[in-house]
Each structure stands twice: as structure tokens, then as C-alpha cells.
Amino acid sequence: MQHYVTPDLCDAYPDLVQVLEPMFSNFGGRDSFGGQIVTIKCFEDNSLVKEQVELDGKGKVLVVDGGGSLRRALLGDMLAEKAAKNGWEGLVIYGCVRDVDVLIQTDVGVQALASHPMKTDKRGIGDLNVVVAFAGVTFRPGEYVYADNNGVLVSPSPLEMPE
């Protein structure tokens, strides 16, 4: 597992990276994570999140535009454990998570706005691999996202940690 330090990436690639507005917190078991972006756009319905974490996620990060909702959790312990089992590097969720005491022990990166104990409805509503924008940054499927306890950033191409 590669370790990323976002301040070092910003210093090495200042003209390449976009940094998300500082509103995310680390809820996962990895201090840092990075990979190719897979996007979901949904609102208080995590049906597509459930579908995606059941697929192979090696080298990928699931970026979920949950509309910034603070009323439902888009990720909990069971889906996080599936994501870890299927090799996902992490998830960036513009929304809430739950089961935070278990998430912090799960081998997957999770950046989200807050915790909330209420689960979502599963109505099968949402869009997969569409361009999404939140926190002042646009996320395009196939680009790259990197996160640690300092913040989250996006790059159009893969980045190497400087020596």
C-alpha cells in the first residue's frame, strides 16, 4: 500500500493538483490513500455505493457526491468491509458515514463530512461515472484523487510521491 502525503504532492505538483475545500475528516483505517476515480452521484440513497464496493476496486477510489446531505449515512461498516475485501483504496464521500468505531479499524480509506447514525433508503436512484463537483473541485472518472489527514486533492494524471 502506497503512503501519500498531500502537502508533499502539492509542493511537487502545484500546477497539476486541485485541493478540496477543507471540510472532510478521516473516518477510515488508512491514514492516506489514492487512486483512479470512480464517481457516483446520489442523494440519501446508497444503492450504487453498495453495487460498486462489491466489484474489484484495486487501484481505485470511489468518489461519492451525496449532495452534502447531513441527514443520512452513505457508508457504514458492512459496505466499508466489502470495499476493503475487494481492494478499494478508499472512498471520498460528500455526505455522512456511520459505524465510525468500526470504520477506523477497517483497511480502507474513508474521507467524509460527518457521522450520522441513520441509514439511507435503497431506491436504486443515482448516476455512475458522471462528472461531479463539490468542495470547489471537479471530479472526472479516470482522473486521480489523493487523501491524507491534511486534506484531499485531485490530479488529471497519476502522481508519484517525491523522494
UniProtKB/Swiss-Prot annotation:
**MF terms per GO, please?**
4-hydroxy-4-methyl-2-oxoglutarate aldolase activity; metal ion binding; oxaloacetate decarboxylase activity; ribonuclease inhibitor activity
Per the UniProt record, which residue ranges are transmembrane?
Answer: none
**UniProt entry tagged with the keyword Cell membrane:** no
Query: What EC number(s) is this enzyme filed under?
Result: 4.1.3.17, 4.1.1.112
- Cofactor section: a divalent metal cation
Q: Which Pfam families does the annotation name?
A: RraA-like (PF03737)
Question: Which residues are listed for a divalent metal cation binding in this entry?
Answer: D99
Tell me one GO biological process term.
regulation of RNA metabolic process
InterPro entries cross-referenced by the UniProt entry: RraA, RraA/RraA-like, RraA/RraA-like_sf
- Keyword vocabulary terms for this entry: Lyase, Metal-binding
Q: Which residues bind substrate?
A: G76, D77, M78, L79, R98
Reactions mediated catalytically: 4-hydroxy-4-methyl-2-oxoglutarate = 2 pyruvate; oxaloacetate + H(+) = pyruvate + CO2
Any binding details for the cofactor? Divalent metal cation.
PANTHER family, alphabetized: 4-HYDROXY-4-METHYL-2-OXOGLUTARATE ALDOLASE 3-RELATED, REGULATOR OF RIBONUCLEASE ACTIVITY A
The family note in this entry says:
Belongs to the class II aldolase/RraA-like family.
Record function comment = Catalyzes the aldol cleavage of 4-hydroxy-4-methyl-2-oxoglutarate (HMG) into 2 molecules of pyruvate. Also contains a secondary oxaloacetate (OAA) decarboxylase activity due to the common pyruvate enolate transition state formed following C-C bond cleavage in the retro-aldol and decarboxylation reactions.
Name recorded for this polypeptide: Putative 4-hydroxy-4-methyl-2-oxoglutarate aldolase
In its UniProt entry, the species of origin is given as Pseudomonas putida (strain GB-1)
Q: What is the lineage of its organism?
A: Bacteria, Pseudomonadati, Pseudomonadota, Gammaproteobacteria, Pseudomonadales
